[in-house]
Amino acid sequence: MPDAVGAIDQGTTSTRFIVFDRRGTIRAQAQREHEQIFPRPGWVEHDPREIWRNTHAVMREGLARAGLVPGDLAAIGLTNQRETALLWDRRTGEPLHNALVWQDTRTDRTVAALARDGGRDRFRAVTGLPLASYFSASKLAWLLDHVEGARAKAEDGTALFGTIDSWLVWNLTGGPDGGLHVTDVTNASRTQLMSLATLDWDEAMLGVFRIPRAVLPEIVSSSAVLGETRDPFPGVPVGGILGDQQAALFGQTCFAPGEAKNTYGTGCFALMNTGPEPVASTAGLVTTVAYRLDGRPPAYALEGSIAITGALVQWLRDNLGLIGASSEIEGLARSVEDNGGVYVVPAFSGLYAPHWRDDARGLIIGLTRYANKGHIARACLEATAYQTREVLEAMERDSGCPLSELRCDGGMTVNDLLMQFQADILDRPTLRPKVSETTALGAAYAAGLATGFWKTLEDLRDNWAVDKRWHPHIAAEERRALFAGWGRAVERSFGWVEENA
C-alpha cells in the first residue's frame, strides 16, 4: 500500500522533489538550481528544457533517497512559480523561446498603453488583477508578436501556451505522445486572462491581448486526479496543481476565511483566505483563487506580492560579493546593532503591492561614512519585513479582519534575525511551522486528498504544529520611526524610469 506522496516544487531559482509521509513530514528531497538569464536590463528568462531536465533528475534522486519505488507513491503533486510564460511546439516538445519569468518587465510599455484607457484597474473586476507586466497575458502577447512563426502556430493549434505547471504536466504525462495540456485555477487566475466569476478563459480579455483560444490549456481543479506519469517513471497519479503561493496557503492549512500566511522566498507573498466569494481590493492587493477541490466551489484569496526579498540576498552575494553564501547574511547583519540609518528599497523591477509602481527602481539611501557592509546587510533583511507590513496593513483594510498572528514559511524563515524583526515591525507574533517547506507540502496535500491518501481537511490541520514563535519587543516609538524612514525611502524610488526610456 502506498505510504508517501511526492511533490514537485518548481521555483524561480531551483526545482525540488520532496517526499512526504502521512504526517506531512519530509522523508527525503533533492534539489537542482537552474540558470537565470538576463538578456537585457529588466529582461529575465529561464530555459524550459533545463527546468524539465532538472525536474526529471530530482524526481529520480528524491525517490531513491527516500528508499522508495514509484509504486510506493500514492500521488504526485506539483507547485510552481506563477505567471512565468512559455510557448512550445506540441509536435516536437521544443520551446519556441525561453520562458519569460514573472520578474520580467519587457512588456511595461504594452501595459502602460493599455492603462491609458481606463487606468490600471480597468480589468480588475473581471480578473481581480491590476494591469502589470508581472502577469502572464502581456508576456504571452510579446511571445506571439516577437517570436518568428509563433502566432501562426498558436492559431492552428501547433503551439501550446502554459505557465510552468502546464509545461511540466505535459512532459510528465507523455509530452508529444499524448501529454495533458492543462493548468489549474490558481495558475490560470494569475494570467490576467481568466474570469474569477466563471473560472474560464474570458473572451474579452483574449481579445484585448490578441490571444487565440486554441493555444490555451484546459483549466482544471487544484486537487483532482488528472492522469498518470509516464516520465521519468510510469503509473503514479498526478493529483494536484497549485501555484506556489496558493500551495503555501494550503500547506499552512489556512482553510477558513480570515486565515493568512506569508511566504519568504525569492519574492515575498502574503495570502488570506476570503472564502467562497471574491473580495475586491481597494488597497493595492490582488484578488485571486486560493484553491479548488474537485467537485467543490472554489475558495478565493487576497494576495500581496513583493518582487524582491530572497533575491536581494542573492544580489548581495552574486553582484556585490558582500557575502560568499546566502546563509552568511544573518551573521553579517548581526555584526551591527541596527541599520545605522540605512534603507535598501529593492525595486529592481518596480514595486508590487500595495504600490504597483513599474517606474520605481532600487536604491540604497541614508549612507554616511559611518555605514558599513553590516548596515547594508541588515537593511536588506529589514526591507523584507517593511514590505510585508505594508502588504498586511492593506490586507486588513480590504478584508476588515485584523490579523492576530502571522504564519510564516519559506527558505528565509531560518533567519532568526529577520523573523524577530518581522514581529517587531508588525507588533504581533510571527510563527514558523515545524515543516517550513509548506509550498511543497501544500502540493502534496492537494494530490493526497485527490487520491484518498488523506481523507479530509481536518486530517491536514492535525498535522500542523509550531516550531518557533517570535514576539515583538521594541518600543512603539522606535517602531514608528523605523517604518516612517522606510516610507521616505520608498517615495524616493518612484519615478526613476520614464515612460519613453
From Swiss-Prot:
Residues annotated as binding ADP: T12, R16, T266, G310, G411, N415
Pfam families: FGGY_C (PF02782), FGGY_N (PF00370)
Gene Ontology cellular component terms for the protein in this record: cytosol
Biological process, per Gene Ontology: glycerol catabolic process; glycerol metabolic process; glycerol-3-phosphate metabolic process
Superkingdom of the source species: Bacteria
Pathway as given in its UniProt record: Polyol metabolism; glycerol degradation via glycerol kinase pathway; sn-glycerol 3-phosphate from glycerol: step 1/1
Reactions catalysed: glycerol + ATP = sn-glycerol 3-phosphate + ADP + H(+)
GO MF annotation terms: ATP binding; glycerol kinase activity
Annotated binding of sn-glycerol 3-phosphate, by residue: T12, R82, E83, Y134, D244
Record-linked NCBIfam families: glycerol_kin, PRK00047.1
PANTHER family: GLYCEROL KINASE, SUGAR KINASE
Function: Key enzyme in the regulation of glycerol uptake and metabolism. Catalyzes the phosphorylation of glycerol to yield sn-glycerol 3-phosphate.
The name this protein goes by in its record: Glycerol kinase
